[in-house]
């Protein structure tokens, strides 16, 4: 079995479906004997360029270990899911379980937002 990192971008109007999509893809991997090493929901972010006249989209990253057939099934699911705008699969040398630099940035932004809301208005 090989290690893969999959990043997919979901239409912003379908953001409420993201948890169900993550569970579906995790279920596909585990049902076929694979392992999900890391799941990161990066949230709604600004895209580098417009896709279907959209400036923002919901980003998700999965690090999995699976065989080629499972990967093909997941990628086929992406192609037939209209909510998925783009996806990218990268073969990795080993399993990545530590938070990605992108997730660290998301956590830092969330901490800054919560700190601003907790500060009393003067």
Curated annotation (Swiss-Prot):
Which organism encodes this protein? Answer: Herminiimonas arsenicoxydans
Q: Which GO biological process entries does UniProt record here?
A: translation
Provide the family line.
Belongs to the bacterial ribosomal protein bS6 family.
The annotated region (Disordered) lies at 96-122
Q: What keywords would UniProt list here?
A: Ribonucleoprotein, Ribosomal protein, RNA-binding, rRNA-binding
Q: Which gene encodes it?
A: rpsF
Q: Which InterPro entries has this protein been placed in?
A: Ribosomal_bS6 (IPR000529), Ribosomal_bS6_sf (IPR035980), Ribosomal_S6_plastid/chlpt (IPR020814), Transl_elong_EF1B/ribsomal_bS6 (IPR014717)
The entry's function note states:
Binds together with bS18 to 16S ribosomal RNA.
* One GO MF term attached to the UniProt entry: structural constituent of ribosome
Enumerate the Pfam families for this protein: Ribosomal_S6 (PF01250)
Q: Which NCBIfam families match?
A: S6
Q: Which GO terms describe its cellular component?
A: cytosolic small ribosomal subunit
- The answer to whether UniProt assigns keyword Zinc-finger to this entry is no
Question: Which domain of life does the UniProt lineage start with?
Answer: Bacteria
Membrane-spanning residues: none
List the Gene3D superfamilies hit by this protein, alphabetically.
Answer: 3.30.70.60
- Keyword Transferase: yes or no? no
Record's protein name = Small ribosomal subunit protein bS6
Q: Where is the composition biased (Basic and acidic residues)?
A: 106-122
């Amino acid at each position: 079995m090989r290690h893969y990192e999959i990043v997919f971008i979901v239409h912003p109007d379908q953001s409420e479906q993201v948890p169900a999509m993550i569970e579906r893809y995790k279920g596909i991997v585990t049902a076929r004997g694979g392992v999900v090493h890391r799941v990161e929901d990066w949230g709604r972010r600004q895209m580098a360029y417009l896709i279907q006249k959209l400036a923002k989209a919901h980003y998700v990253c999965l690090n999995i270990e699976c065989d080629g057939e499972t990967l093909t099934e997941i990628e086929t699911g992406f192609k037939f899911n209209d909510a998925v705008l783009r996806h990218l699969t990268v073969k990795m040398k080993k399993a990545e379980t530590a938070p990605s630099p992108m997730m660290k940035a998301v956590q830092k932004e969330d901490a800054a937002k919560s700190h601003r809301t907790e500060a009393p208005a003067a």
